[in-house]
Amino acid sequence: MGKLRPGRVEWLASGHTERPHLFQNLLLFLWALLNCGLGVSAQGPGEWTPWVSWTRCSSSCGRGVSVRSRRCLRLPGEEPCWGDSHEYRLCQLPDCPPGAVPFRDLQCALYNGRPVLGTQKTYQWVPFHGAPNQCDLNCLAEGHAFYHSFGRVLDGTACSPGAQGVCVAGRCLSAGCDGLLGSGALEDRCGRCGGANDSCLFVQRVFRDAGAFAGYWNVTLIPEGARHIRVEHRSRNHLALMGGDGRYVLNGHWVVSPPGTYEAAGTHVVYTRDTGPQETLQAAGPTSHDLLLQVLLQEPNPGIEFEFWLPRERYSPFQARVQALGWPLRQPQPRGVEPQPPAAPAVTPAQTPTLAPDPCPPCPDTRGRAHRLLHYCGSDFVFQARVLGHHHQAQETRYEVRIQLVYKNRSPLRAREYVWAPGHCPCPMLAPHRDYLMAVQRLVSPDGTQDQLLLPHAGYARPWSPAEDSRIRLTARRCPG
């Protein structure tokens, strides 16, 4: 740790010894000297210097590790800087040539012929993978029944043969989707690293339409770009899959394919068929072109469940193509509601007096950042939605909404949902045919039969505007944890 003490300024650093730019150091020094000279007390954390450049990969072939560092500048009385002083990323180089000595083997071999264990005896060492700590250099003495630990392995060594993790500073770390080791970053359902499932839509439907005769029936188009595809049914019928070139991938031409993994549209399709009537298709995606899902009908269709995630910009073309082809695809139904036949027009007797409802009392004022932050951070879902209509049911108001944009979700949302609000005079009152930003909670009954989205009384629901959109995006960054 090096220290620079001109005029009560302290330079704290750890690890690497690269020097930041001289001009930048001079500015930081003058700023600190001015603050100290004026008697300004230092508070809060210190300031990080910019990251230095990434080092070269620790390996010349295969996988290795690259590192970059930064330093914390702080005055007396300031807290340490928040965050890490070092970042490690995985670097992937061309595969090592056949016959190359593995990295761990090479490290053990460095101790061949050298006296160890306080004696003059020497041994030939090979890696030993049965020790508890994978990131220690545990080497077995050839021809003997013992191993010895020579400390930590070098950074970039594989934790174990075939493992995805690599050792860094004695710890086994895996790379997140951002390439940084130990970051824990994951792809969301849309394929975005660290995303919030807000750049795609979840399509989930049940296909029940089919004729009475045996043969192939169209179920759905699985469009290009679809991810996390799952299809399932329970019957003696068989799922069939056709590529964009008109050739069958699975169960075509009245021939049932064996269970297994098939290549289709740039992804692996896993086809399983139990000894019972259940049959499933699963694919991670994304698909590189359209696929046509069909069913080879042999008995009445009890229902085929299918789901996938689709980029938002592809959803409208998908709907248009399905409707243009005349395929009987049902629209997404709101959560927890079975499809109902259209209601017959209500007949109102002539001269029936209509009683005006009692006026609703004014709603409490819910403006302000604190209210927005409270409901955003404590909600299960935050989205932009258009109110299609509302209905009073028992002591609740039910809004039917169409989801436009999702800011936060803890489980998939459908294109259309029902949002419930307590009372016949909910606060806030939502007007039909308007777009709102709203924060709602998910309520599931203990037996799982009821699954509702609840807009609490005096909760967060405000007309959508560009300004409110900016405020809610800023609020998302301020939630704890």
Curated annotation (Swiss-Prot):
PROSITE patterns: NTR, TSP1. Keywords: Disulfide bond, Extracellular matrix, Glycoprotein, Heparin-binding, Secreted, Signal. Proteolytically cleaved to release a C-terminal fragment containing the NTR domain. Contains at least one additional N-linked glycosylation site. Coiled coil: none annotated. It is found in: Secreted; Secreted, Extracellular space, Extracellular matrix. GO terms for molecular function: heparin binding; microfibril binding. SUPFAM superfamilies: TIMP-like, TSP-1 type 1 repeat. One of its GO terms (biological process) is extracellular matrix organization. Its main location: secreted. Residues 45-97 form the TSP type-1 domain. Glycans are attached at residue 218. Residues 345-355 have a biased composition (Low complexity). The keyword Disulfide bond applies. GO terms for cellular component: extracellular matrix; extracellular region; microfibril. Residues 331-361 are annotated as: Disordered. Residues 1-42 form the signal peptide. Residues 360-479 form the NTR domain. Interacts with heparin, FBN1 and FBN2. PANTHER family: ADAMTS A DISINTEGRIN AND METALLOPROTEASE WITH THROMBOSPONDIN MOTIFS PROTEASE, ADAMTS-LIKE PROTEIN 5. May play a role in modulation of fibrillin microfibrils in the extracellular matrix (ECM). This is ADAMTS-like protein 5. The gene is ADAMTSL5.
